[in-house]
Curated annotation (Swiss-Prot):
Gene3D superfamilies: P-loop containing nucleotide triphosphate hydrolases. Belongs to the uridine kinase family. The gene is udk. This is Uridine kinase. GO terms for biological process: CTP salvage; UMP salvage.
Length: 213
């Protein structure tokens, strides 16, 4: 079944910049306007590479902020399938086991697909498939505080482990890969999920594209 009206919205930015908040807000509000069957969210995190062949001591060394950690070929294939009107089975990744689980999430074609992740715009193929590219531009100190709270409260991590990871990979990879990808964004949103005007503009552009299909 062809699905020529499928629109892909790529939302990227630093870890804890507010990407998920914006994605959820847009999803919820367009659900109310168009119906939830018309819109869905896919997270880039689901496409971290399968590491089941590695020992745990090797898995924990993964630099999750580097493009090489992603199974980008699978993501691209899934995006193309959705553009063509085909359903996909999205992997489920376990941060506890540092690899994919045996489960998948069945994702049916939608008129609007929100794709959310830190490294999306570093890949030219993703940029070409995205109809709208968004960069959430939040100061790094704010991102770090949010990440610290999230990882300690929701993932049971220690203060020192979060600080060590931030120094070793999160900040360096942001400066090397993520921040430079901002140049490819169609829309740059400062202040993250609290920027109501920018969210309204994004929604308006999505609806405009839908009407053109």
């Amino acid at each position: 079944m062809s699905n020529p009206s499928c629109i892909i919205i790529a939302i990227t930015g630093a870890s804890a910049s507010g990407k998920s908040s914006i994605s959820s807000t847009v999803h919820k509000e367009l659900c109310n306007e168009l119906g939830c069957q018309e819109i869905g969210i896919i997270t880039e995190d689901s496409y971290y590479k399968d590491q089941s062949h590695l020992e745990m001591t090797e898995r924990v060394k993964t630099n999750y902020d580097h493009p090489s950690s992603m199974d980008r070929d699978l993501l691209i294939q899934h995006l193309k399938n959705l553009k063509n009107g085909s359903a996909v089975d999205v992997p489920v990744y376990s941060y506890v086991e540092h690899t994919r689980t045996n489960e998948t999430t069945h994702f049916t074609p939608k008129r609007i697909v929100i794709l959310e992740g830190i490294l999306l715009l570093t890949d030219e193929r993703v940029r070409q498939l995205a109809d709208i590219s968004v960069f959430v531009d939040t100061p790094l100190d704010i991102c770090f505080i949010r990440r610290l709270q999230r990882d300690m409260e929701e993932r049971g991590r220690s203060l020192q482990s979060v600080i060590d990871q931030y120094r070793a990979t999160v900040r360096p990879m942001f400066l090397q890969f993520i921040e430079p990808s901002k140049q490819y964004a169609d829309i740059v949103i400062p202040r993250g999920g609290k920027n109501r005007i920018a969210i309204n503009m994004l929604k308006a552009q999505i609806l405009h594209l839908l009407n053109q299909k």
